[in-house]
Amino acid sequence: MFADFLKEIGIDGWWLKAVRKNDYRIECEHCIKDSKEQLLNRKRIDLFFIDEVNNWVIVIENKINSEVRFYSDGKHTQLNACQKYCRKNRKFRDYKTLHILLSYNKKNASYIEDSGDWQNADYYQVFKSLLKYTLEDAIITDYAKTLFAILFPQKNLNEAVSDLLHRNAWFYHHVISKLQ
């Protein structure tokens, strides 16, 4: 399933083969501890995929209803902290690394447009990669329902209706209309 998501966001080749080996573990809210750098210390990485057999990590920063945070220096973001952690940590610095920003917020995507270090992904791609598994697994079905409810909340008419309509139209055009 994870390989399907990577494929959906345009990741292929070596990464797909590596993920299909299934030698990795996933840590949610991976905590960066005991860093000498204030920028890194006690920060959290939303999803941290680690394969210690094949020496790779995948970092997924999840921004469903929030924006990428800048730190007090005004120059560095939490995305910079994630990258720096993977580069500087003795355990991971020689590992192959993939960074994914998961968000439907266009402002968040703009932070990574000029960087070759992060891959942008949105929740519609997650949803699309889950659809083929919903009949096989009740947990996936429940997650897909939850994700849909988060993406399309029941809002009052005077609350960001145009945003909701835009997301509905985008979802139909990019996901539903392409189902076979």
Question: Where in the sequence are the language-model features?
Answer:
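Charged, terminal alpha-helix-loop-beta segments
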Residues: 1-180
